Amino acid sequence: MHTCAPPHHFSSLKFPELHGSSKLNNLQVLRSFGLSKRSFKVFAVAASSSSSMSEASNYIPAAPIFLPEGPWQQIPGGVTAAKGFKAAGIYGGLRAKGEKPDLALVTCDVDATAAGAFTTNMVAAAPVLYCKNALDISKTARAVLINAGQANAATGDAGYQDVLESVGALAMLLKLKPEEVLIESTGIIGQRIKKGALLNSLPKLVNSLSPSIEGAGSAAVAITTTDLVSKSVAIESQVGGTNIKVGGMAKGSGMIHPNMATMLGVITTDALVNSDVWRKMVQISVNRSFNQITVDGDTSTNDTVIALASGLSGSISISNINCHEAMQLQACLDAVMQGLAKSIAWDGEGATCLIEVTVTGAESEAKAAKIARAVASSSLVKAAVYGRDPNWGRIAAAAGYAGIPFHQNNLRIMLGDILLMDNGQPLSFDRSAASNYLRKAGEIHGTVGIYISVGDGPGSGQAWGCDLSYDYVKINAEYTT
């Protein structure tokens, strides 16, 4: 028997007020995004030393968070929700004067168990190369520095030296070893970090560190580039009967494609977990989240996710990935990363809706995930969604070329709750209702659900993307990457 039931719906969308735009309500924000996404810009005077971090966090609104249902509660705080973490975001002169903050810092009060996941692009940026080396040397880290404006990719030895000098200067200010400081960069490929501006801004950045919600919010804004919304989330749950928190922030809206995407992320938790288990858990969650999103099929040079575990919750120490406590923490980590990943896909350049592809009945999770990725990545599927065309043929074709064997007579496709294909054969369906389903999602920047079953196997997986609009071409024709 084939199963192709839609999963639970996710949380509602919430937006804070915009800086200087208190009369702009949530619906107006959504409509502005949906009609002409990158024409919607919110700039304010660059944050001065007297500006509060709460003001910095309102340069752009916060993204909607699409958390899966589970034994957790969404809480405020982002990367600072977990015990032991502080964050800050300031304007440091790396962007043009008057734009958003461009320097962010996340620190931990103790040696945090550290893990990272990085781009598969062979032209990896200098900060990616540095972080890989640092994590080979040390199992712990205390700080993550992020700059926006310059990617510091394809910059040769000089770009790598810029990383070493930046890390060394911050380590000195924080009284840490250089390998305890990690770094992420985003911006234009081929441009080195504006090192002078960065170094001059580090004292102010360190002095701005705060364990507050505002600290987390300002950091989440500072790492954005073409993003229209900042992405930040935190949850509270239990591991072994003890309350723990997991939080995170991410950026990305273009150059999004597995593996990883043009995205940066920082994940924090106060759970106690040993290094080997933590690194395995982080890779598993990345595979279920950031490696399952696609906007335009391009894989960036800078993709990085750094995950830090302070262990300050007082929870039981996790040293076996197969134990019950590890499974509890893994589920929390999956939820946070998937929430952030879906927000990135929702914010795809020029997009009017999020596309969520769910595949069931495969032989394994990995095989289901690969089929879901193929469908979510298909330019023809994405264009059909934008055109409000319930084109089941494009969905079936994408599933078929994913490289995963299945019998086409087992193929079943649903669009929302409308059955388009069953037993490998197209069905008679209400095209007007299906088109209206797509149209409504586009009007409110909502979610289009595509559900596919390929057999009776135990494997299921999801992938997320967005529709492909005229605005995507316009945005990327005008923006230098």
From Swiss-Prot:
One of its GO terms (biological process) is ornithine biosynthetic process. It is found in: Plastid, Chloroplast. Disulfide bonds: none annotated. Substrate binds at residues 225, 251, 262, 349, 476, 481. InterPro entries: Arg_biosynth_ArgJ (IPR002813), ArgJ-like_dom_sf (IPR016117), ArgJ_beta_C (IPR042195). One of its GO terms (cellular component) is chloroplast. GO terms for molecular function: glutamate N-acetyltransferase activity; L-glutamate N-acetyltransferase activity. Its EC number is 2.3.1.35, 2.3.1.1. Belongs to the ArgJ family. Heterodimer of an alpha and a beta chain. Catalyzes two activities which are involved in the cyclic version of arginine biosynthesis: the synthesis of acetylglutamate from glutamate and acetyl-CoA, and of ornithine by transacetylation between acetylornithine and glutamate. This is Arginine biosynthesis bifunctional protein ArgJ, chloroplastic. The lineage of its organism: Eukaryota, Viridiplantae, Streptophyta, Embryophyta, Tracheophyta.
